[in-house]
Amino acid sequence: RSSVPVNTPIYVCHLSADRAWALVETSYTYGWIPVEDFASADNEFVKTWESGCYAVIIRDHTSILDEKGQFLVRASVGHVFPLAERLSDHLQMLIAVADRDRRAVIKWGFVSVDAAAEKPVRFNLVNAAKIANEMIGEPYGWGGLYGNRDCSSMTRDFFTVFGIWLPRHSEDQVKEAGAYIDLSGLSPEQKEKVILEKGVPYLSLLWRKGHVMLYIGSKDGRALIFHNIWGIRTKDLAGREGRKIIGQAVITTLQPGRELRDIDSAAGSLLDNIAAMNILVRANQEKPSP
């Protein structure tokens, strides 16, 4: 279903018969994990962890070090940790590690202010573009395979930086938050017109079945999207289906691959298949300021 970042709070629901696996829930998913991958937390730990003041990682593949400069954990954009103190050039954070009895204990972790910030980061177009630039080109990984992101984990991590919580599944992200706009009954031209007229750059999600995209603005009258995509569906003259692999986070129009001779016109066009838009504008903010 989904990978879970390091130091994510979980609830253990059940152990397998051999006690090697645990069925766990997080705030956004559930599934089985090896018991060696988590540590139990007592009430005192929980009280300390729920500090109410948090830091968020803003640079992918960031190493968090202890006070001696030794490696503790690796984190990426959107990963959240309790914030202890802001120093001149570093943030001091709480990091959970397991002791010999598999109990969670707290260590100090340090990370450069270039790689982490107090959560939430102020939303504006400059900050939004910076976070997108950190993610662009990152490999595609369905469900977090090999530690990479798929389309919905990319959008989820992106918005976490700005304090906007999203569900994990692409359809839920569009239907369970913000202002939902149904595009399913419109022609491709009408869809793009609505997106250009009503979409808020970096605050609007576009959705087709199985794929979610972030609207980021327009160029030459065409909508631009930022998304992590596996590939474009193709079909040759013999009717054989395939994929033109992209396999990373990219910026495209709503018709990537339209120049391909063998693009599957029915299933391969994002614009033709977009069914909805969701505008995630917070109540106290009409549009992001530069």
Predicted segment positions?
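Terminal peptide-recognition signature
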Residues: 24, 154, 213
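N-terminal capping segments
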Residues: 82-185, 209, 226, 278-288
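Short, glycine/acidic-rich beta->alpha junctions
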Residues: 2-5, 16, 73, 150, ...
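Structural motif
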Residues: 8, 79, 201-204
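Glycine-rich catalytic cores of cysteine/serine-nucleophile enzymes that process amide/ester linkages
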Residues: 41, 62-63, 67-108, 138-149, ...
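Boundary regions of SH3-family modules and the immediately adjacent low-complexity/disordered segments
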Residues: 1-20, 25-64, 71, 77, ...
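...with weaker cross-activation on analogous glycine-rich loops/strands in unrelated enzymes
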Residues: 3, 167-236
